[in-house]
């Protein structure tokens, strides 16, 4: 069953189109991430879902019911859309206690006090905040304040929650833990979550599917984490998801070269995925592998230890490229240092037509 449907939604500010012909269905109980660079329209899309921004055209449905349709003159008011929202900056009211913050949506609905207390207790239990009912926000850490914000969203709606950059303001360790907590909570409750972020790693870790938007607000790809990483739809997606190396490539007399300041051999038979015509290769740093029998030669210019991996920078054909090697792989006894001549084997590369500049 589809929980949310955007049908050909176009959004604009002052005549400037931000999102054009946006179509997306979100299933009941699914976590869908909307990911893209700053200014691509991610937040505008969920503002439209919440009733805070009217589309120029298109329709929005929740549980099969129209929430917005300009053609049919339907526009359900924000307070009647029954959607929970979690913002980046916690947005807990500093003058209200934890229980008052969480119970505020229920108070607005004029529920009986005992029912409010019951639902507040239940929501705080879902986010491991029981015992903090009388605390003020100033007495809480950033992670605890965000848990309060999530609990408040649950009292607004356990069925559908929007999370807009909910972990951006937390430190790295708290971010990791909060993602796990959000997933466990969602599994317990069956909540449908639309997760807005520019953090690709967080979206891929948390979400069942991810929607990739480009700078123009167009959908480039919708897929699982594996689909997006293993089969990026285009060059933008490849570049946007993780670190990448890009370089022009050519074929000459049945051999394949990196077309740099000088041509550098990398394959002596047709590579998988090769396309005819001017092309560029995209390759991840982990897929450029040190191999004494590799066809590609370069000079190691820098080795940087990052704890769980090494970053290596290798100059090939006049340009510098990044390689990555896990610390475990580096336990083979082979040490690589600046100034070494190295040979490489390239795997899992992707090919894209060269963009023509007007």
Question: Language-model segments: which ranges?
Answer:
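Helix-to-loop junction immediately C-terminal to a conserved catalytic motif
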Residues: 50
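Conserved ABC transporter NBD signature motif
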Residues: 58-70
């Amino acid at each position: 069953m589809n929980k949310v449907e955007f049908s050909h939604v176009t959004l604009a500010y002052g005549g400037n189109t931000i999102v054009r012909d946006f179509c997306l269905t979100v299933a009941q109980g699914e976590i869908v991430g909307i990911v893209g660079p700053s200014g691509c329209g991610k937040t505008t899309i969920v503002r439209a879902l919440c009733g805070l921004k009217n589309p120029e055209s298109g329709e929005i449905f929740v549980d099969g019911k129209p929430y917005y349709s300009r053609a049919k003159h339907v526009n359900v008011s924000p307070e009647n859309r029954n959607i929970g929202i979690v913002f980046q900056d916690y947005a807990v009211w500093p003058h209200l206690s934890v229980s008052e913050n969480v119970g505020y949506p229920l108070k607005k609905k004029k529920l009986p006090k005992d029912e409010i207390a019951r639902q507040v207790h239940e929501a705080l239990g879902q986010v491991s905040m029981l015992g903090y009912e009388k605390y003020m926000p100033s007495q809480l850490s950033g992670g605890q304040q965000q848990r309060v914000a999530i609990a408040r969203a649950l009292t607004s709606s356990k069925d559908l929650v929007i999370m807009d950059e909910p972990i951006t303001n937390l430190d790295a360790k708290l971010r990791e833990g909060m993602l796990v907590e959000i997933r466990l909570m969602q599994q317990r409750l069956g909540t449908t979550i639309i997760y807005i972020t520019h953090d690709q790693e967080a979206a891929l870790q948390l979400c069942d599917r991810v929607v990739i938007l480009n700078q123009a607000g167009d959908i480039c790809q919708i897929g699982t984490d594996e689909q997006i990483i293993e089969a990026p739809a285009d060059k933008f997606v490849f570049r946007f998801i993780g670190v990448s190396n890009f370089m022009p490539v050519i074929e000459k007399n049945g051999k394949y070269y990196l077309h740099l300041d000088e041509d550098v051999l990398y394959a002596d038979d047709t590579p998988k995925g090769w396309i005819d015509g001017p092309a560029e290769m995209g390759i991840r740093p982990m897929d450029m592998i040190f191999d004494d029998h590799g066809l590609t030669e370069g000079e190691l210019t820098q080795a940087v230890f990052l704890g769980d991996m090494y970053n290596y920078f290798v100059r090939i054909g006049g340009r510098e490229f990044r390689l990555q090697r896990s610390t475990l792989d580096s336990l083979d006894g082979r040490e690589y240092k600046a100034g070494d001549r190295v040979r490489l084997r390239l795997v899992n590369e992707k090919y894209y037509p060269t963009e023509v500049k007007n």
